[in-house]
A protein has these predicted regions:
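Short beta-strand->loop micro-motif that forms the acidic, two-metal-ion catalytic signature
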Residues: 35-40
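Catalytic core of pol beta-like nucleotidyltransferases
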Residues: 1-19, 25-31, 42-99
């Protein structure tokens, strides 16, 4: 978890946030569980450079440590549009703030 936090602090731009959600956040992960990371950026639209500079470092870390890390990324406005979904409720309820 510490290395994931370090990558989050290095990769997430000012105004952005990263949250761990899923089994690791709930404390019920088992061997083979993946790490689910929600990345929220404070901008109007995502660009290819956002994926290269923000989410890709998490994937590289996963390769480095032999774990599957699955970052998903939205703008804050996009994420707000998910408020009515069970996914939003689950992430909001169970997530751990990384940055």
């Amino acid at each position: 978890m510490q290395r994931i936090r370090e990558v989050a602090h290095r990769s997430i731009p000012k105004g952005g946030h990263a949250h761990l959600y899923g089994s690791y956040a709930r404390g019920d992960a088992h061997q083979g569980s993946d790490w689910d990371i929600l990345i929220l950026l404070d901008k109007d639209n995502l660009e290819q450079t956002d994926f290269d500079q923000v989410s890709y470092p998490f994937i590289l870390l996963g390769c480095d440590i032999g774990e599957e890390i699955n970052p998903i990324m939205y703008t804050k406005k996009e994420w707000e549009s998910y408020k009515i979904t069970p996914f939003y409720e689950n992430v909001t309820r169970d997530s751990i703030n990384l940055v």
